[in-house]
Regions:
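Short hydrophobic/aromatic-rich beta-strand segments that constitute the beta-sheet cores
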Residues: 30, 57-58, 96
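Glycine- and acidic-residue-biased ligand/ion/polar-headgroup-sensing regions
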Residues: 35, 44-62
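Ligand-binding loop in jelly-roll beta-barrel domains
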Residues: 80-103
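A cytosolic small-molecule/anion-sensing beta-strand core signal
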Residues: 24, 51-52, 71-72, 90
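Conserved short histidine dyad/triad with adjacent acidic residue
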Residues: 26-42
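Short acidic-glycine-tyrosine-enriched beta hairpin
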Residues: 62-80
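His/acidic/aromatic-lined binding-pocket segments of jelly-roll/cupin-type domains
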Residues: 38-41, 45-50, 67-68, 86
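A short, N-terminal "cap"/entry segment at the start of jelly-roll beta-barrel domains
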Residues: 1-30
Length: 103
């Protein structure tokens, strides 16, 4: 059993992660970042929960780029095949639940 205080985790570089758990082929990680990730498509489902900070989530629907601002407590669900990019607005901490080894 472990307890985590997400606001206290700081990485040494953008998208550093603290591994929290693995079950089946699913991983749960707490990420720290202050820079955008990259456009990508996961090979499975993804749950992206903002624990601290603010993140602009851009995603594509039928080739059109759309955007939504996620604040602390907000959750983004990407179904398999959803192309997206997370763009933090300053420092952010996010909990990501996804297929083990996913991009």
């Amino acid at each position: 059993m472990n307890f985590y205080r997400s606001t206290e985790f700081t990485g040494s570089k953008a998208w550093d992660a603290q591994h929290i758990a693995s079950f089946g082929n699913t991983s749960v990680k707490l990420h720290w970042t202050d820079r955008p990730y990259k456009w990508h498509i996961n090979d499975g489902q993804e749950v992206f929960a903002v624990m601290d900070g603010c993140v602009e989530m851009q995603y594509k629907e039928q080739g059109e780029i759309k955007s939504r601002v996620l604040n602390t407590g907000d959750i983004f669900y990407a179904s398999e095949g959803t192309e997206h990019i997370a763009r933090p607005q300053g420092v952010a901490r996010v909990l990501v639940i996804e297929k083990e080894g996913s991009v």
